[in-house]
Structures are given as C-alpha cells and as structure tokens.
Amino acid sequence: MEELFKIYLKLREQDKKLLKFIPINNRIILSKINTNSNADSELKYAWINRSLAQVSKDKTSAILGLLDSDSEEQKIARRMTLKYRKGKNFPVPFEINNEDDLDKFLNIIDNNYITIKQNYPNYSNDEFLTLKKYNFKNKKIIIANSENSNKIIGSNESLQKVYEKDTIWIKLNIELFFNFFLKKNNIQMTNESFESIVFTMVKLVKSILIPSEFYKGNIDNLRKKIKESLSNNILPVLKFNDSISGYGVHYPKKINGEYNIEEIESVLEDDICFKNYLTSVFDQKENDNKFNNIVEKIEDNGIIIQKYIDGNDYAIGFFKPNQLYSQFFSLGLLDLDISEVLTNGTSHYGDILHYENDFLKSILKNTIFEKQEELFYFSIEILIYLICINEGIIKDPNEFINVEMEDFGIQFMINNKTGDLGLIEINARTPSHNFNHFNLLSIYGEEFWNSNLLASKKILCKSVKIVDIDEFNKMTTNEETENKLIEFFANKIKSFSDRFNLVSFQIIKNGFYIYYYYFFEVCNLMEETIRKFEIYMKDSILEIKNLK
C-alpha cells in the first residue's frame, strides 16, 4: 500500500504543471501554473488585479486546462485577459487534439469575445492569434460551463447523494480509482492486496457518511420525528443552513460537554414547548438576523436532522494553523500535527490534498492506520472523487487529476470511546469565478510562490456579507460603477492596513460579500478587532449610494 501512495504522489507531481484558463468574473486569465515546490518559480509577473466576481444568469464562466508548454505562444497567452459577451456558452466538453480542433476553438473565442483586454505586457490581438501556430497535437483542453465551474459541493446535498448509493457502486468506483493509478504507472499488485485496499476504503467511506434527513414542513411533525429518534437511541442534531458557504448551527447544544437528553425530552412534550425552544436557542445569536422567525424558516426552507456524535472535532483543509488560532477559521480547522499540508504555496488552489512521504509513512503501517483521524485524512480525497463522479463534474479517474477545489474544508467528529465516526461538514467549490489568492499574487508577485507566503505568514482569508444583493444591484449597474466600488473599498481598507488587506468582492445569490485577509503575526487576532473591522465595512457600504 505504501508503494501505491508513492506512485500516487509521483503522478501528482507529473500532472501538476498545467496551463490554466481561469475565470474571474467575466474575464478569463490565461496563465502558466507551476505548483512544483521543488522547482524554481517561473512566475515572473503579477496577476491582473481584478477582484469583483459576479455570478448571474446572463454571464458564464469557463475553465480550460492545457498540458504545459514553454513555447513563446504560451508565454503570450499567459499575459492575456479575454472579456466575453454576455449570454454565450462554450460547448462542453471541448477537446483539442489536432489543429482543426484548435481552429474551431479559436473561432468560438472570436464569436464570443467582443474585446481583448490587454494587460501586462500589452500584446496585440494579432499576436494572440499566433497561438494558431502552436502544434496542439495530442494536447487536450477541457472546458467546463458555468454550472459545473461554479458548483458548490455541500454536505446537505452531495454527501447525502453519495451515501444513498449502494455499496456496489461505491466499491466499483473505488476500484476504478485505484486501477487507474496502477495501470498508468505499470504497477503490479496481487489481487489480495488490491481487494484489501478497496475493502478498507469502502468501509471507511460508508462509515463516515452519517445518514441525514432533510425535513421541511410542519413543526409538530418535526417534533415527532425527533421524539421517535430518541426512542430508538439515536440522538438527533438539528442543522440549519442559511448561506451558500455551508454555515450551519447545531442544536441542541451540549452542556458541560454532554448532550442533555432530559432537556430535549422536556421540550418535546408538545408543539408549543418545542416552538418556544427553537425560538429561544436561535434568538440567542446576537446581531444576527439569519435566525429570526426560525419556525417559519423551517416550515418554508427546511432543516437537516443528523445523528449526534459525541467526540472530538477534527477538520481537514489546506491551512495548517496553530490550535490557538483555529477559532478564527470559518471552517474550524484544527492542528492535527500533520507535516506541511500546504506544500505548494497556495491556500485555495492546487490539488485537493497534499501529502508528504514522511506523513504517508506515519499513516500507513502494514496497511493499518495508526490513528482514525489520519485514516480520515487520506480517505477524503477518495470521497471527493466519488462526489465528483456522482455530480457529473468528471467522468473517470483520468479527469480527476485536473480537479481543484476552492474554499475546501471538511469537519468531522470521532467518538473517542466508541470509535464512532461522523462527517459533519464538507465545503468545496470546483474551479470557479473567484480565487482569492490571485489577488495576493497580484500584490506579492513571485514572492507569493517562492516563500510560501500563506504558510509562513499565516494569512487567513475570510468573507463577510455586507449588503443584500437587491440593494447592491440598485447601487451598481455598469463597469464604471464597478471600478468606483473597487476603488472605494480599497481606500476604506487603508485604516486597517497594518492588519487587514482587501482581497476581493464576490456577488452570490444571497448577498454581496467582501473577502479580506489578515496577518497572524501583525494582528493580535482578538475577536473584538475582527468584529470592529466587519462592522466598519458593513457601515461603509451605505456610502456607495453617493458614487453615482
């Protein structure tokens, strides 16, 4: 099994150098991505500092991946930003295997793009067309439409779908997953060893996917469901999701670290008691109107009922913070004492997970994992693979090597006494409209890659909703206003320049968000400081009305 992972790592290194066409808002940046931490960085330029990402029905996004080339034509392509006409979609998928395919692809660009915005350095339109001279034979470009390129993978949807799959489906796809790597690297393995690996992973995936139920409707029926689960010795958790980011609150809360069964039983006596209980616990959220009228929201929008697992919290993600700082991470990342997870210099881009050989050796010992959380850590990639297959993001393992995740985080719990495992939260976004670290790179350029800035400086990216989408749409209707908006917030942020830096803005279906980051080494990370910053930005939005 160790050999398998060695090959796995080697394969990751081989396929890591990609030329990516990456969408930011209605602009597509073409650039060489070199995430090989052992190689000298070839990124000698800064990314275009465009930060307003907008997702709407009349705009599309496209993700293109092309095998690496150091040709002059590709160097030109890296510097280009294309802006395309609203309402146009690329065919999906679009493969370039020969020059005819390339001509078709360039015609698509010609027909869909009304301008080519030139940045640094300024190449002409004619120079862009020299891409036609490049021999694309045996190269492949995969273009994803906006539906998949912006797809949110959430615990209440994608995980549940995988859980509902039967064991045969899970086993078959895990077999395909391992067979791909074995054949690609000409690795021989006994049937017994192969079956052992597959059996372990199938069992693991089935164990971490806690069955959850989405309930929408009458509160009294919800009360009866919870009461019934208690009678079957299943301790329920109500999880209320009210944002695209997967933000959720679990109730009932533990008291002194214990699940208070008597309290729950007492509030389940009748409909009125239960409604009062729900209202009281959610109303305790100060300065947060997400949970107002909670009873009506459950009836209209629904709530998730999960099995309760008493145990320690663990989380998986690109960041590796000290435990002292973990409370400030929206995904609650904790330090698992894993050797550098962030091995390739970026936080929200790259392969889904990074492993080092020493770490893998510490996990694997005669195919037996030393700790449950370490076993979890490895299995997440297989789980993401199953989700991508089931959601139609990829068709086979060969495409999985090109899948990246943005805003990736997983939280699970382990019952130390019983060994019970449960996946609480998984939040991930396939390559999408907004990559926060691009803006960091535009500020720091090559240093961002060479010094592993996010890891060494412990930068945290965070978002805060500052205005409803309807209100924002009334304020800004054109690109000129958009530029003013960016300039406005860039100036506003200066008063916090010693601790905070603006990363990007993002518009999603339920609001207008501002992304920012701050330095652990500069800011004392007192929660009050962060809260003041967010309140400041929320108040500042009111001034936008005067921009017109």
Language-model features and meaning:
Residues 392-410, 453-457, 544-547:
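Flexible, glycine/charged-enriched surface loops at secondary-structure junctions
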Residues 233, 253-254, 269-342, 409, ...:
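Phosphate-binding site of ATP-dependent enzymes
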Residues 179-302, 357-382:
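Active-site nucleotide/adenylate-binding loops and adjacent lid/helix of ATP-dependent enzymes
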Residues 40-55, 65-233, 242-244, 251, ...:
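Conserved N-proximal alpha/beta basic substrate-recognition cap immediately N-terminal to
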Residues 242-244, 308-312, 401-406, 510-511:
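A short catalytic or substrate-binding loop motif that flags glycine-/basic-rich loops and adjacent residues
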Residues 445-548:
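Peripheral (often C-terminal) accessory segments that flank ATP-dependent C-N-forming ligase machineries
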